[in-house]
Amino acid sequence: MVKDPAFLFYFNDFTVGTMYFTNEETGQYIRVICRLADKGHLPEEEILKICNCQKIPNCILGKLKQDEQGLFYQQRLENEQTKRASYVKSRRYNLKE
């Protein structure tokens, strides 16, 4: 099955949640979210490359969680991807009937 190329983006929630980020941090964060949506949980080294920095900014780090392997993920993104996958699956099922 082809990976879903989209996720719901709640712009008001994003705007409020990043209100005190600098423009640079906002850009870094959106790039991290996009990479997480595409690849799943990420190691710190990859996030550092995305952010082009030596330390993940605290404001971005505060939006991420770590799994048992120490990889980073964004819980809201995972929830939205799961809901979307369930919805798409239900639509496919309805088409078969």
Located regions from the model:
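Detector for short helical micro-motifs
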Residues: M1-E97
